Amino acid sequence: MDSISLENFRELQSAGVQVIDSRPTVLFSERHIRGTIGISINGSFEYMANAIFKKAEKLILISLNERLSESFLRLEAEGFTDVVYFDISLWFEAGLDSSLVSRVSASSASKYLEKIVDVSNSEDWEVLHVKGVSNVPLVDIVKNPNKIRQDSVLYCGNGHKSMAAVSYLLTKNIITTDITGGLSAMLVDSPDLEI
């Protein structure tokens, strides 16, 4: 599939067309285009797409080449049919500004306990979560971003929904931090946390 041009991408983004970046969370966190939303193909891709984006609206997709067809097909299966592809290397090669996501390691999570919010589905939260931490699922964040305070530290099971939440909140000027690897990593690297 051919990429739209850099000029076309900038025009569409300026016009309010939302951008899905389906690259792995580590790549998105280290370097992405401001205003794009990271929903990794490696996570609950369909759930996150449906939670954040409207099927009737045009979308721009950023993806690794080897996962491009899969990303398109999975979006199409969910009813997202007006999707165009943008090759992010065009942005980077042009030397344009890129953004990063603030992250903290799972081993340091206990330092942020008063700021931590679990953005997992409520069903997953009921099964397993950090003791004393509140739950605001991704779908609820999209409905009302102000449920999350500035400087909150977000996590989910494996770090995919929390990256989606952090990047979505950035588009609403709410700055938060992601815990790398989510609860799975905290169970291993932060044994002092009560689960």
Which functions belong to the PLM regions below?
Residues M1-S14:
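C-terminal accessory/connector segments of nucleic-acid motor ATPases
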Residues D2, I20-R23, D118:
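Short secondary-structure boundary micro-motifs
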Residues D2, V17, S40-N42:
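A general structural motif
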Residues T25-V153, G157-I195:
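Rhodanese-like catalytic fold shared by cysteine-dependent sulfurtransferases
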Residues Q13-F28:
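Short, compositionally biased "basic patch" segments
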